[in-house]
């Protein structure tokens, strides 16, 4: 359904940014949800959606006309596709451009999140959400994720160019890191190196809950910390 969103357009006095809002209502009985994001350079933030909403977004975009939104529902599964409209050679640090995308998700369903973005900043606190899988494909970016412990297994896959990546994982969850990349500076405090490119926390095999992190990056600073 391409029309299931509210639209509000305005301009910011300093950045000439278009302001738009979008929303998708949660279908009754939905247990799992899939979110596909496509976007260029922007700062991506995450908040909880209002009751009754599966997904919502608040965007403030300079130099970009907005996003397209599509929603599908089948049985107990609901899918949202949210993609930035085409842009021409605009970078995040272009002078005078302000682009921020605040995503809002319902905490009830089990989520599969897939993001393909250009250069950008991404900061997500995922602790309130049941995230079974999150896949990030980015160019030059700063990625900051805080993962939770609401599922027995969660998977994180990151493919990036030049990136600063920081991931926080709970102390009570076993965690495995697989890393493939040319030039990576890494900080995996609390992990044991099993072999080249493979790291695990102590007691991983017997942990009741597990997080699997798989990264493939060009040149990155990569930190995984326990909390």
Task: Tell where the protein language model's regions lie, with residue ranges.
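Active-site alpha-helical segments that house and flank conserved acidic catalytic motifs
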Residues: 35-37, 115, 179
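Extracytoplasmic/periplasm-facing segments of secreted or lipoprotein envelope proteins
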Residues: 28-31, 41, 117, 157-159
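Conserved "repeat-terminator" motif of extracellular CCP/Sushi domains
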Residues: 83, 104-107
């Amino acid at each position: 359904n391409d029309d299931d969103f509210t639209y509000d357009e305005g301009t910011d006095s300093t950045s000439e940014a278009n302001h738009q809002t979008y929303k998708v209502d949660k279908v009754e009985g939905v247990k799992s949800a899939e979110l596909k994001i496509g976007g260029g350079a922007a700062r991506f933030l995450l908040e909880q959606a209002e009751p009754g909403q599966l997904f919502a977004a608040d965007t403030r975009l300079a130099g970009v006309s907005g996003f397209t939104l599509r929603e599908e529902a089948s049985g107990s599964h609901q899918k949202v596709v949210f993609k930035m409209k085409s842009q021409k050679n605009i970078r995040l640090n272009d002078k005078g451009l302000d682009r921020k995308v605040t995503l809002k998700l319902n905490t009830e369903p089990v989520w599969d999140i897939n993001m393909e973005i250009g250069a950008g900043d991404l900061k997500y606190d995922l602790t309130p959400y049941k995230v079974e899988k999150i896949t990030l494909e980015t160019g030059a970016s700063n990625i900051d994720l805080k993962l939770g412990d609401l599922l027995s297994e969660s998977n994180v896959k990151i493919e990036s160019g030049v990136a600063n990546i920081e991931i926080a994982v709970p102390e009570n969850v076993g965690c495995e890191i697989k890393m493939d990349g040319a030039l990576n500076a890494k900080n995996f405090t609390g992990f044991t190196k099993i072999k080249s490119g493979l790291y695990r926390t102590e007691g991983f095999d017997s942990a009741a809950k597990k997080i699997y992190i798989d990264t493939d990056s060009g040149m990155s600073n990569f930190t995984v910390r326990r909390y």
